[in-house]
Every structure is written in structure tokens, then in C-alpha cells.
From Swiss-Prot:
PANTHER family: UNDECAPRENYL-DIPHOSPHATASE. Keywords: Antibiotic resistance, Cell membrane, Cell shape, Cell wall biogenesis/degradation, Hydrolase, Membrane, Peptidoglycan synthesis, Transmembrane, Transmembrane helix. GO terms for cellular component: plasma membrane. Belongs to the UppP family. GO terms for molecular function: undecaprenyl-diphosphatase activity. It is an enzyme of class 3 (hydrolase). The chain crosses the membrane at residues 45-65, 95-115, 119-139, 191-211, 225-245, 256-276. Bacitracin is thought to be involved in the inhibition of peptidoglycan synthesis by sequestering undecaprenyl diphosphate, thereby reducing the pool of lipid carrier available. This is Undecaprenyl-diphosphatase 1. The lineage of its organism: Bacteria, Bacillati, Actinomycetota, Actinomycetes, Kitasatosporales. The keyword Cell membrane applies. It catalyses: di-trans,octa-cis-undecaprenyl diphosphate + H2O = di-trans,octa-cis-undecaprenyl phosphate + phosphate + H(+).
Length: 278
């Protein structure tokens, strides 16, 4: 069992908070930082710690979008009681989110041995970072960016939600990267693509976080580091979400494309030189 210090918990919480919702792969970043700090990345306590602090980032997106979430849930509840309310976009969108989550749940359960086994390799993470960069570049370049959030359809939700499977099977692809790229291919504007990515990710991230939490708490990572890391993750993730929405309103995704390639190359280098082990 590996003890994680308070200082290391702060660093890892910050890394998780920054990268969980940016299209850059939180998994790859956490593994790199853990390796550089001399923390054994395959230790049960470390794996458990990473799973728990993710809950802080999930809480951040729930708080940040709380008004939107309450509006959508309220519309859904009204629609269940009143047929006239079922024509409201928020009511339909609530069902779309539910339906769009089903594919990733089914694949996650069916492919769990692969996901926890060979597909968890850092070589896969590094390769997925670079391949995902190419997909993101192409999507941002060819997408027409003409459709807003109110123009989203059931088809959009299913395709974007289903694309989360890419990140599940190839973790370096990044859940945010996969969903945002898919939304851009569907001609959504960058802000709409980003917000849709957040909304469709909430059920999957929350479910996965709670599922991992029950096992992670028993790994012996330490209560104080867990609390600190989770709190830091929450604060940093909240700021990261706010920054990302402002950034994509004025910029392309090219900065993320270049950065992802650099991180992928760095990860290949660390693996090749033995600094990190897959």
C-alpha cells in the first residue's frame, strides 16, 4: 500500500480538476504526474485515490450547471404528469440524456475485463491521445458550427452520448474529447458542443464515480489526503468548467489538439525510457 501525502493529494486533485472536463484525458495526466512524483501508478491505494477525487470534479459540474439541471429535471417531472408538457424541449432532452447513457453502461459492463485489463495500458492511453487529436482537429476544421444548443435533436444526443464509448475503451481518447468532436461533426457550434458534452457526461460520470467509490474507499488511501484531494478537485474543476466555456466561445480547439499530441509524445517517451511502466 502506498501512502499519499497531503502535498501530493493537492497536486493530484488539481490535475484531476483541470483535466476531467477539458478534452485532454485526465487519465493520462494523472498517470504522468503520479509517475513523476514517484507514486506507484498500479498500487491499489493510488488507483482508489484517483477514483475518489474524481467525485469532486463530478460535484463541480453538478453545482455549476445546477440551475440547468433543475430546469430540465422539473420539465421532465411535469411531462410525466401532464401530456401537454411533453412537447417542451427540456422534457425531451431529459429522455435523450437517459437514452444516450444506455450504450456506455452496456459496453462498460460487457467489456469490463478488457477495460480493466489490456485497454488500461498506458501505451493505449498515449496512442489514443494522439489519434484523438487528429479526430478533434478534423471535426473542428470541417464542422460548420452553425447549430446552437436549442437545435439539438435525439440523433445528436445518441451519437454524442454513444461516442463516450471511445473514451471507455481507449482512455486517452478523453470522454470530453470524443463527445465534443462528435458534436462538432454534427455542425454544433463550439459552445453548444461543449455544453452538450457536459450534460451527456453527467449520468455516466456520476454513475461511474459512485460505482468506483464503494471499492476505492477500502483501499487504504488515507482519509485526510482523500478529503483534501477531493476538495481541491472540486474547486479547480469548477474554475476549469467556467474557463472552458469562455474559451471555446472565442477560440478553436487547435490549442487542445497541439497540447494532446505533446502529452501523447511525452507519455510515449516516459514509457520508452522506463520512467513510467504500463
Amino acid at each position: 500500500m502506498s501512502a499519499i501525502s497531503i502535498g501530493q493529494a493537492v497536486v493530484l486533485g488539481a490535475v484531476e480538476g483541470v483535466t476531467e472536463f477539458l478534452p485532454v484525458s485526465s487519465t493520462g495526466h494523472l498517470k504522468i504526474v503520479e509517475g513523476l512524483m514517484g507514486i506507484p501508478v498500479d498500487d491499489d491505494a493510488v488507483i482508489g485515490f484517483s477514483a475518489v477525487i474524481q467525485v469532486g470534479a463530478i460535484a463541480a459540474v453538478l453545482v455549476y450547471f445546477s440551475k440547468d439541471i433543475m430546469r430540465i429535471v422539473s420539465a421532465w417531472g411535469r411531462g410525466l404528469r401532464d401530456r401537454e408538457e411533453r412537447y417542451h424541449h427540456d422534457y425531451r432532452f431529459a429522455w435523450w440524456v437517459i437514452y444516450a447513457t444506455i450504450p456506455i453502461v452496456l459496453v462498460g459492463l460487457a467489456a469490463k475485463p478488457l477495460i480493466k485489463g489490456p485497454l488500461a495500458s498506458l501505451w493505449v492511453v498515449a496512442g489514443s491521445l494522439i489519434v484523438g487529436s487528429g479526430v478533434m482537429w478534423w471535426a473542428d476544421r470541417t464542422g460548420r458550427h452553425k447549430r446552437g444548443e436549442d437545435d439539438t435533436s435525439f440523433k445528436d444526443a445518441m451519437l454524442v452520448g454513444g461516442s463516450q464509448i471511445l473514451a471507455l475503451l481507449f482512455p486517452g481518447f478523453s470522454r470530453s474529447g470524443a463527445t465534443m468532436s462528435t458534436a462538432l461533426m454534427l455542425d454544433l457550434d463550439r459552445v453548444a458542443a461543449t455544453r452538450l458534452s457536459f450534460f451527456l457526461g453527467i449520468p455516466a460520470l456520476t454513475g461511474a464515480g459512485l460505482y468506483e467509490l464503494k471499492d476505492a474507499l477500502g483501499t487504504g488511501a488515507g482519509a485526510a489526503p482523500l478529503a483534501v484531494g477531493t476538495l481541491v478537485s472540486f474547486v479547480v474543476a469548477y474554475a476549469s468548467i467556467a474557463w472552458l466555456l469562455k474559451f471555446v466561445a472565442k477560440h478553436t480547439f487547435n490549442s487542445f489538439v497541439v497540447y494532446r499530441i505533446a502529452v501523447g509524445v511525452l507519455l510515449f517517451g516516459l514509457l520508452g525510457t522506463g520512467v513510467l511502466h504500463s
